[in-house]
Amino acid sequence: MAKLHDKYKETVSPELVKKFGFTSVMQVPRIEKITLNMGVGEAVADKKVMEHALRDMTAIAGQKPVVTVARKSVAGFKIREGYPIGCKVTLRGERMWEFLERLVDIAIPRIRDFRGLSVKSFDGRGNYAMGVREQIIFPEIQYDKIDKIRGMDIVITTSAKNDEEGRALLEGFNFPFKK
């Protein structure tokens, strides 16, 4: 079992019960899923680009991503309906905890010019979204094997009722928010 999952059960959950006065452990916010999304607009012109993006995403997430396709045709972007334009992975359970551990302990400290995560990235319902500009911050990506630096979106979906509970939950996992 992942260290962060044990930490959640042993320290984070009891702290949240004390802080917010929950009467049942089922009321305590928890992380439900983590979604990784990578938009690959260049895949329209070159099919190889999508293969590289899928390889990178598989290495980072530890599971095969789903290819996302365009819902509408957009002439300005030279995109037709059904064209592959990105990929995404939804992590739950054990893989989610392992990814979260790698994100907090290894990947975030490797971000260049990092000054803390923005508190404004909460959505009002306790979920947190962040963008990563380079996939090379993850240790699974070999620097000499990448064709292009790509970013991705990381969304952490929680069962928190509001941003305050969501922030307290993520701070329990040592997320480095700006003060």
Swiss-Prot record:
Keywords in alphabetical order: Ribonucleoprotein, Ribosomal protein, RNA-binding, rRNA-binding, tRNA-binding
GO cellular component, one term: ribonucleoprotein complex
Organism whose genome encodes this protein: Shewanella halifaxensis (strain HAW-EB4)
SUPFAM superfamilies noted in UniProt: RL5-like
HAMAP family reported for this sequence: Ribosomal_uL5_B (MF_01333_B)
Quaternary structure annotation from Swiss-Prot or TrEMBL: Part of the 50S ribosomal subunit; part of the 5S rRNA/L5/L18/L25 subcomplex. Contacts the 5S rRNA and the P site tRNA. Forms a bridge to the 30S subunit in the 70S ribosome.
Protein family per UniProt: Belongs to the universal ribosomal protein uL5 family.
GO terms, biological process: translation
Gene Ontology MF terms: rRNA binding; structural constituent of ribosome; tRNA binding
InterPro entries: Ribosomal_uL5, Ribosomal_uL5_bac-type, Ribosomal_uL5_C, Ribosomal_uL5_CS, Ribosomal_uL5_dom_sf, Ribosomal_uL5_N
Domain of life of the source: Bacteria
Magnesium as UniProt keyword: no
Ribosomal protein in keyword set: yes
Gene behind the chain: rplE
Name of the protein in its database record: Large ribosomal subunit protein uL5
A Pfam family hit: Ribosomal_L5_C
Function noted in UniProt: This is one of the proteins that bind and probably mediate the attachment of the 5S RNA into the large ribosomal subunit, where it forms part of the central protuberance. In the 70S ribosome it contacts protein S13 of the 30S subunit (bridge B1b), connecting the 2 subunits; this bridge is implicated in subunit movement. Contacts the P site tRNA; the 5S rRNA and some of its associated proteins might help stabilize positioning of ribosome-bound tRNAs.
